[in-house]
Amino acid sequence: MEPSFKLSSGHKIPLVGFGTWKAETTLVGKAVEVALDAGYRHIDCAAVYLNEKEVGEAFTKKFTTEATVKREDVFITSKLWNTFHKKEHVRPALERTLSDLGLQYLDLYLVHWPVAFEYTSNDIQTSGSTQEFVSIRETWEEMEKLVDAGLVKSIGLSNFNVQGLMEVLSYARIKPAANQVELHPFLSQPELKKFCDKHNIHLTAYSPLGNGAFVDNEEVGAIAKKYNKTIPNVLCKWAIQKNFSVIPKSSTPSRVAENFDLFNFEIEEADMLFLDKMDKNLRTCDPAKFWGVPLFN
């Protein structure tokens, strides 16, 4: 049985998910089908990935046409994009995501970034956008209403640091159940983990493979060889043993299945400590570089 973590909302999140970031529209549907067939029961989506319609087609095929997987057995996450932080835009943005995914509800809906862009249309804008001040409180209060309406089961945040989390906790009627951030041995974020553990906020690791940073790493390679596993297996298992959920991504069917092969081994404590000590604050997804917004400095 795949391990899961009970969120503060009372719902369980499976610790191994399938990520759809940077997945090409022509490949993502098949990849999601392969993931569900391989046993994944946690699929991570976002409006800004511009592939939710294709993911939705895979859901319809598996949940309805073939009826090989039950909707209620799959934990599905999506995210509110930066352009839709104003209170009048939050619910319509979710409704577009639900329509694209072919779903009645989401298991988890996240505020994708603690940054708001100026709203110009319902189209997703990623670059050249003007920042606009919208308080996270305004956005969060609308997120809470989505839970009240039964459209989402849990709500959370993404890319929030300790300061941002403290702010939301100070006024939240419904506390954030999760915070999705970049996490891997080169960026293990111990202070963030400590804070989230204390406040029962679950951490999901995106880019758990470090966006290729570990491909030729001999030390992690040696650990992988010891357990007769791949480097991605070791990186994901490291995260799971720290109670993070992970959302590795791949469009290669064999690799999709391989990345799920995590439940027949345990990393020994000495190796876990060795991986912990590799931390060098290497952030591969930094808005200071692509938006000029130093969120993490």
UniProtKB/Swiss-Prot annotation:
Q: Which Gene3D superfamilies match?
A: NADP-dependent oxidoreductase domain
TM helices/strands, residue ranges: none
User: Which InterPro entries does this entry report, sorted A to Z?
Assistant: AKR, Aldo/ket_reductase_CS, NADP_OxRdtase_dom, NADP_OxRdtase_dom_sf
Which catalysed reactions does the entry list for this protein?
an alditol + NADP(+) = an aldose + NADPH + H(+)
Q: Name one GO cellular component term.
A: cytosol
Residues bound to NADP(+): 10-19, 207-259
Which GO MF terms does the UniProt record name?
Answer: aldose reductase (NADPH) activity
Quote the subcellular location field of this record: Cytoplasm
Q: What are the coiled-coil residue ranges? A: none
Which CDD domains does the annotation name? AKR_AKR1-5-like
Q: Which PROSITE patterns match?
A: ALDOKETO_REDUCTASE_1, ALDOKETO_REDUCTASE_2
Q: Which SUPFAM superfamilies match?
A: NAD(P)-linked oxidoreductase (SSF51430)
- Keyword hit for Zinc: no
**Binding of substrate, residues:** 112
Q: Which GO terms describe its biological process?
A: cell motility; glucose homeostasis; negative regulation of aggregate size involved in sorocarp development; protein secretion; response to bacterium; response to oxidative stress
Task: For this UniProt record, give its keywords in alphabetical order, as a comma-separated list.
Answer: Cytoplasm, NADP, Oxidoreductase
Q: What are the positions of the active site?
A: 49
Phenotypic effect of disruption: Cells show a decrease in the ability to reduce both glyceraldehyde and glucose in an NADPH-coupled reaction and a decrease in glucose levels. They grow normally but form long unbroken streams and huge groups. They show normal adhesion but a reduced motility. They secrete low levels of countin and CF50, two component of the counting factor (CF) but are responsive to CF and partially responsive to recombinant countin and CF50.
Query: Record's family?
Result: Belongs to the aldo/keto reductase family.
Q: Which purpose does this protein serve, as stated in its record?
A: Catalyzes the NADPH-dependent reduction of a wide variety of carbonyl-containing compounds to their corresponding alcohols with a broad range of catalytic efficiencies. Probably affects several metabolic pathways in addition to converting glucose to sorbitol. Affects group size.
Q: What is the protein name stated in its UniProt record? A: Aldose reductase A
